């Protein structure tokens, strides 16, 4: 019997699966908390907040998603046997997945430090936890006292045999040609993240329309649980604008040329012009006795000028169809491409679009270079990786150099875009790594990484199925009017209402990512954005084809050499050697990476062609097979009464009958043979794994006497009969 109030438990059916919300059971001291369950997967989501002591200039929302190994009945493999260190890449990506649709739902100006924690406490390794975490984050905030615009729910859309599937299992995702995670309110889609195996744009739109309808019961469930268990919302009063002061700032900014500053095409020059306007405005205001002593008012100058800049940019687009850099709404920035510019890399490309530049390098490695990922679903192996770097110099800034969440997210998106065009491991067994170094950035740097990454793959000679390009689309929405922008720059991203990244081939989509700053996006807007993006993508692909239209026919001379051998499975033991002695010697001497399959298939990666040939010979040494009529140098391993056993190859022994040890008759084997002695013998018979040899045949040939297999066979058979006669005589003697 519990002293607590009974928990509130609600459930609904979505996509043929039961989704369960339960609150008032765990983590009740949090501002808002609940568990979200599907099958045996349970995610505990909590939200806490505290008032801000001072305005930070941004909304301090922290989202952390974590997977605990106990959830899948496993113990962490770290030295301390606990989850320590920084979050995994998957945890980071899902944290971003939660943050992106949740953040816009908080009111602007909320003076609260908010932390959302999502912990996977049970995993059936069948139902994915990421969409439960996104939905749970929304529900937890709905239950809390924090103001929140509306409930959102997340879902995953797959496609099997041409049919959409909502929230497919982990195994079904592997078979699906579509894997789209989306979040939506009751009115519209607010976030999209996904990948596809070259799927047409209209199918993506249909999937989102279908998925939006399917997840409505989850939104209804959130509203219901809020009614039953939600806290009273804290009153939120937006900071009242000082209209008189704002008007004065705008007039001064206009006087000092803010309109002209926002028409400067070059990013850095525009930045300097805007800074100069702001400094002039502040200088005047600091001399005004009405404001000189009010630092709190002066601190709002940047925000006021920023809002004015946003208004100027948007109005120019709406009224004049002109953007900051002078383009219309559908034009892609000028493109410059260079491939093969780094002589010692396996593949390289420098992709420049406007003031955004990405240097992409492809490196090929062996199967031992793949990445092993430890997760709740078990250990998986990645043979393709794309790492995106965004150093501070790319935007002319000074900042600490470390891998940020943003870099991990952009790299994951670019990786999704390119993974479907790579050849299978059966035809191209290399591990492939792309590094995208952002050297300059003025928007769409992740899309530049996709374009440059594809070109570097082609320069490396990777036989991709089709080239891929990416482009970022923006949106300006004023009342009922909307304008889609092609290939947005950084300021258009900041001042616009949408960032919709789309990558694909000429035939279809391979990756999408959409974030918006408004309450939702209709499918009509998404359809327009995708159609416009397709035209831009085809243009970009045509520019890429001018630099390199097909993958190079050969790999770089500096790339690893690859070959496959098939050996007798019985020889594997000898190739490996006791304690791995032989295989270690081969890899040490040649520098090769060797993967041995139990079936006898051996995959070899060597740094040079010479090393490859050496590795082959060293492996084949242990897999030699005797040939009939061929001479071999053997070592005497065992002496028997009727002959000797010699090792003629690794793991291959031959029996030499006493009658075949010498030309003349000998009474005992030891008359001509000693243990450990080397001698040349000829293979005269092979029956299965049994090998018979003759020293006598070698001696006869040395004397110039022609030897034939029949002759040795006759001697062999005769002597075997003679042996049986002597054996039978001994038996008769014992009987008498």
Curated annotation (Swiss-Prot):
Positions contributing to Mg(2+) binding: 493, 499
Main EC class the enzyme belongs to: transferase
GO (cellular component) term, any one: cytosol
Basic and acidic residues: compositionally biased ranges: 720-736
Keywords from the named record: Cytoplasm, Magnesium, Metal-binding, Nucleotidyltransferase, RNA-binding, Transferase
GO molecular function, one term: RNA binding
KH domain location: 560-619
Function recorded in the entry: Involved in mRNA degradation. Catalyzes the phosphorolysis of single-stranded polyribonucleotides processively in the 3'- to 5'-direction.
Entry-linked PANTHER family: POLYRIBONUCLEOTIDE NUCLEOTIDYLTRANSFERASE, POLYRIBONUCLEOTIDE NUCLEOTIDYLTRANSFERASE 1, MITOCHONDRIAL
Protein name (database record): Polyribonucleotide nucleotidyltransferase
Provenance organism: Lawsonia intracellularis (strain PHE/MN1-00)
Lineage: Bacteria, Pseudomonadati, Thermodesulfobacteriota, Desulfovibrionia, Desulfovibrionales
């Amino acid at each position: 019997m519990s002293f607590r109030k009974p928990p509130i438990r609600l459930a609904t059916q979505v996509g043929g699966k039961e989704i369960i919300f339960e609150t008032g059971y765990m983590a009740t001291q949090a501002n808002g908390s609940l568990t979200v369950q599907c099958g045996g997967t349970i995610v505990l989501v909590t939200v806490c907040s505290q008032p801000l002591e001072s305005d930070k200039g941004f909304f301090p929302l922290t989202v952390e998603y974590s997977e605990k190994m106990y959830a899948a009945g496993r113990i962490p493999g770290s030295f301390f046997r606990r989850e320590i260190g920084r979050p995994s890449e998957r945890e980071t990506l899902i944290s971003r997945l939660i943050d992106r649709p949740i953040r816009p739902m908080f009111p602007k100006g909320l003076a609260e430090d908010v932390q959302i924690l999502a912990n996977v406490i049970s995993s059936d390794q069948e139902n994915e936890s990421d969409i439960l975490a996104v939905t749970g984050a929304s529900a937890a905030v709905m239950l809390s006292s924090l103001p929140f615009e509306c409930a959102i729910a997340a879902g995953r859309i797959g496609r099997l045999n041409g049919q959409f599937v909502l929230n497919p299992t982990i195994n079904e995702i592997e078979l699906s040609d579509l894997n789209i995670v989306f979040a939506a309110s009751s009115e519209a889609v607010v976030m999209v993240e996904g990948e596809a195996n070259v799927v047409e744009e209209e199918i993506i739109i249909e999937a989102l329309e279908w998925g939006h309808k399917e997840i409505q019961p989850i939104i209804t469930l959130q509203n219901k649980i809020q009614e039953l268990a939600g806290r009273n919302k804290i009153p939120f009063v937006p900071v009242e604008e000082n209209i008189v002061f704002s008007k004065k700032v705008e007039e001064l900014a206009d006087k000092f040329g803010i309109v002209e500053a926002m028409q400067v095409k070059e990013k850095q020059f525009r930045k300097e012009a805007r800074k100069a306007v702001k400094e002039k405005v502040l200088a005047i205001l600091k001399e005004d006795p009405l404001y000189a002593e009010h630092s709190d008012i002066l601190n709002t100058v940047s925000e006021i000028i920023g809002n004015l800049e946003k208004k100027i940019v948007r109005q120019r687009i709406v009224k004049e169809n002109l953007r900051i850099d002078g383009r219309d709404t559908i034009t892609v920035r000028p493109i410059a491409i260079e491939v093969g510019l780094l002589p010692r890399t396996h593949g390289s490309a420098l992709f420049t679009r406007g003031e955004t530049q990405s240097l992409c390098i492809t490196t090929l490695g062996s199967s031992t270079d793949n990445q092993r990922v430890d997760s709740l679903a078990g250990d998986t192996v990645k043979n393709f990786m794309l790492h995106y770097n965004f150093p501070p110099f790319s935007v002319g800034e000074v900042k600490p150099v470390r891998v940020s969440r943003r870099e991990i997210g952009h790299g994951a998106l670019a990786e999704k875009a390119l993974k479907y065009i790579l050849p299978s491991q059966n035809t191209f067994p290399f591990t492939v790594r792309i590094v995208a170094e952002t050297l300059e950035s003025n928007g769409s740097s992740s899309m530049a990484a996709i374009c440059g990454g594809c070109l570097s793959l082609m320069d490396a000679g990777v036989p991709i199925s089709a080239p891929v390009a990416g482009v970022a689309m923006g949106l300006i929405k004023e009342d009922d009017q909307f304008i889609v922008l092609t290939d947005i720059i950084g300021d258009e991203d900041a001042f616009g209402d949408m960032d919709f990244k789309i990558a694909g081939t000429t035939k279809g989509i391979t990756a999408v990512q959409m974030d918006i700053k408004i309450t939702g996006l209709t499918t009509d807007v998404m359809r327009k954005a995708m159609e416009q993006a397709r035209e831009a993508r085809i243009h970009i692909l045509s520019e890429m084809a001018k630099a390199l239209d097909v993958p190079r026919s050969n790999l770089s001379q500096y790339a690893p050499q690859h070959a496959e051998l098939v050996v007798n499975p019985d020889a594997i033991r000898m190739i490996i050697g006791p304690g791995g002695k032989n295989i270690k010697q081969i890899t040490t001497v040649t520098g090769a990476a060797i993967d041995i399959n139990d079936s006898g298939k051996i995959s070899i990666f060597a740094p040079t062609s010479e090393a490859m040939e050496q590795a082959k010979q060293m492996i084949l040494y242990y897999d030699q097979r005797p040939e009939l009529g061929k001479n071999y140098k053997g070592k005497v391993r065992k002496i028997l009464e009727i002959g000797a056993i010699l090792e003629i190859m690794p793991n291959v022994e031959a029996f030499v009958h006493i009658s075949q040890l010498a030309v003349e008759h000998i009474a005992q084997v030891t008359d001509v043979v000693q243990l450990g002695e080397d001698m040349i013998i000829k293979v005269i018979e092979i029956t299965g794994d049994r090998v018979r040899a003759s020293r006598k045949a070698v001696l006869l040939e040395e004397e110039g006497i022609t030897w034939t297999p029949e002759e040795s066979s006759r001697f062999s058979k005769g002597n075997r009969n003679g042996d049986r006669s002597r054996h039978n005589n001994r038996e008769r003697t014992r009987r008498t």
